[in-house]
Amino acid sequence: VTPEDLLGRDPVAPISTLMEKNTTGKVVMISGAGGSIGSELCRQILYLNPRSLVLFETSEYALYRIEAELKDLAQRTCIPVEIVPILGSVQHPKRLKAAIAAYEVQTIYHAAAYKHVPLVEENVIEGIRNNVFGTLEIATAAKRQGVESFILISTDKAVRPTNVMGATKRIAELVCQALASEPSDTVFSMVRFGNVLGSSGSVIQLFRSEIESGGPLTVTHRDVTRYFMTIPEAAQLVIQAGAMAKGGDVFVLDMGQPVKIMDLAISMVRLHGLQPYFVDGAAHSQGAKEPPRTDGDSGELEQGDIPICVTGLRKGEKLYEELLVGNNPAPTQHPRIMTASETSLTMVQLMPVLERLLAACKAQDIQTIRRIFNDLPLEYSPSNPHLADLIWNKSPQTVLAAPQLVK
């Protein structure tokens, strides 16, 4: 079963001139180069004949794997591209500045982020440091070094966020919007998309693993829906949207209709040549080896090979997701890419709030972090009313060292 089998719509075709504008013959850096989206960006950009590909990644193993894959791909396709593997964190400004300057980077795709909703919900401070201040560091370094184009990979979870991950990505957008409002040689833009089929930790990987182990498939709610795209589609959207940017743009993809996760689970089971049936989710969550079968409130799926159970929404999880803030999407030259009209702040307005946020992270002051989320134009409406960091829960008086804010 491939992700394309489950998409439920035609993939979005790329426009070659947009794909080439910021990549062909350019020095391109990808942060988070070893991740699901970052690695696909690397593959797509390699085929577009960049001068150099600078892979910036904090995970040694992920960097090793993507470097080896790209070098093999370049050799097999006879593409003369320099591939530069750099270990580093986006939270380290000196390392970022040195890498950008040394290789005279022209385009940056910022894909490095903590993205898993439940993990970030319980590791609030590190989520903020990486997603907010990591973005501030790399975006500021790009501006100072005269990078031509900076594209932030964002998410539909940044729209009226109900979880910490979404809130941090919306603040990252505010950072890029604020930098775009100032005189600069760098064109800043943001690209939002929904869930990526087959990416690290995606529902497809989860369901495939659950099917292989005999089930049950775990669905958090019968009515939960998500927008989806394939990994190549997501990478192509990022590349093309960045090429259309004028500065401060928020791009979104027309992803068709949202997909019901329950329907996705049923389809995956059937595409494996099996039949699904429902079991009691409460009994499963209590550790029952053989939870009782149910009719799924539909009178159907009482008999089958693979069980499906409903486990309840996770911390910070939305039932439905939106791709746009407001009701004024504007078209672009790509028929399936639009721009969203978003509230923004200047750096003069934003920096004092970020200073407060950094101080709250250093002090592990979760309550102040919550207030700052409410003060910023995020439309933050947490589904989890008890925001708490796992370490803060155990030692609320402990103060951790944090990187200094860019001045």
Model-derived regions: residue spans:
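Flexible, Lys/Arg-rich cytosolic regulatory linkers and terminal tails that connect or flank
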Residues: 1-27, 143
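N-terminal Rossmann NAD(P)H-binding glycine-rich loop of SDR-like oxidoreductase domains
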Residues: 28-46
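Hydrophobic/aromatic anchor residues within beta-strands of the central parallel beta-sheet
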Residues: 85, 127, 188-191
